[in-house]
């Protein structure tokens, strides 16, 4: 059983995966709030409580964090509470297997890397990956499995909250599909802007990528896949997205773990 931890700015996904390579699958998944000042002990208590008896069945652990301080605590947690379980964290020096053809590879978020890795492994062709998180990342991987870059926009919830916070006449609203793109009250108007507006933003970015990037035209075989917590809300309004994979990031983490575990076995004791 592989423990996978995906720490983002606002929420953390904890998953358990069984099997390996093409037989691997996510068997359980939890979503908890990210606390930037969380300690290793607090993380251990939370995760051990979630996975229960599977804690004794772990054969490996892997994780990433877009919050550097939390990644440090994840490392300490794994070393102290599961010392015999091999672990691989996505950080500089870890082999991901995907070339980063960008100006500064160190700037590329670990979540973007593993998403593109998982998409390329799953579809075996050029892909555009749309991750709906606190930010919306639209990333591009070539037919050779190279990370070409992408575009980053504010996330749906972040934008909606910012509009409410900076306007006396607006308030925070539930993210839900309104009756129509033409809202009949303030809540519906904000929902229409969030749902239909961001669907249009993503469709527009995908269209521009297909126009501007060689090998991504309408005549080329390109997979467009979405992932992320708010993706299901927008999927019915998206015209450019063909696939949805809820577990794309967790599977990307698994791929990196499998690539690096031989080196880990040489340094760490076997799992209990």
Curated annotation (Swiss-Prot):
HAMAP family (alphabetical): Pantothen_kinase_3
Pathway(s) this gene product operates in, as recorded in its UniProt entry: Cofactor biosynthesis; coenzyme A biosynthesis; CoA from (R)-pantothenate: step 1/5
Oligomer status and interactors: Homodimer.
Residues noted as binding ATP in the record, renumbered to the chain: 6-13, 134
Stretches that traverse the bilayer: none
Cofactor requirement: NH4(+); K(+)
Gene Ontology terms describing biological process: coenzyme A biosynthetic process
Cofactor annotation comment: A monovalent cation. Ammonium or potassium.
A Pfam family of this chain: Pan_kinase
Keyword ATP-binding: yes
EC assignment: 2.7.1.33
Record: residues binding substrate: 109-112, 186
Molecular-function GO terms, alphabetical: ATP binding; metal ion binding; pantothenate kinase activity
PANTHER family per the UniProt record, alphabetical: TYPE III PANTOTHENATE KINASE
Annotated active site: 111
Described function: Catalyzes the phosphorylation of pantothenate (Pan), the first step in CoA biosynthesis.
InterPro entries, per the entry: ATPase_NBD (IPR043129), Type_III_PanK (IPR004619)
Protein family membership: Belongs to the type III pantothenate kinase family.
Protein name: Type III pantothenate kinase
Gene3D superfamilies: 3.30.420.40
Residues the record lists as binding K(+): 131
Native organism: Mycobacterium ulcerans (strain Agy99)
Catalytic reactions on record: (R)-pantothenate + ATP = (R)-4'-phosphopantothenate + ADP + H(+)
């Amino acid at each position: 059983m592989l423990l996978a931890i995906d720490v983002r700015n606002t929420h953390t996904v904890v998953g358990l995966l069984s099997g390996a390579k093409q037989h691997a699958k996510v068997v359980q998944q939890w979503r908890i709030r990210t606390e930037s000042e969380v300690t290793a002990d607090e993380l251990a208590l939370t995760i051990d409580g979630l996975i229960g008896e599977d804690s004794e069945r772990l054969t490996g652990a892997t994780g990433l964090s877009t919050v550097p301080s939390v990644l440090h605590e994840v490392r300490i947690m794994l070393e102290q509470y599961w010392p015999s379980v091999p672990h691989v964290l996505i950080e500089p020096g870890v082999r991901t297997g995907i070339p980063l053809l960008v100006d500064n590879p160190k700037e590329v978020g670990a979540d973007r890397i593993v998403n593109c890795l998982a998409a390329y492994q799953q579809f075996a062709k050029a892909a555009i990956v749309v991750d709906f998180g606190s930010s919306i990342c639209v990333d591009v991987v070539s037919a050779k499995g190279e990370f070409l870059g992408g575009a980053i926009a504010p996330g749906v919830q972040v934008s909606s909250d910012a509009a409410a916070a900076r306007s006396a006449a607006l308030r925070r609203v539930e993210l839900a599909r309104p009756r129509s793109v033409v809202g009949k009250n303030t809540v519906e108007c904000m929902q229409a802007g969030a749902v239909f507006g961001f669907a249009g933003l993503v469709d527009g970015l995908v269209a521009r990528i297909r126009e501007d990037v060689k090998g991504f035209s309408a005549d080329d075989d390109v997979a467009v896949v979405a992932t992320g917590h708010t993706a299901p809300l927008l999927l019915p309004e998206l015209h450019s997205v063909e696939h949805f994979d809820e577990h794309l990031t967790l599977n990307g983490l698994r791929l990196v773990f499998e690539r690096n575990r031989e080196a880990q076995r040489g340094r760490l004791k076997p799992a209990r």
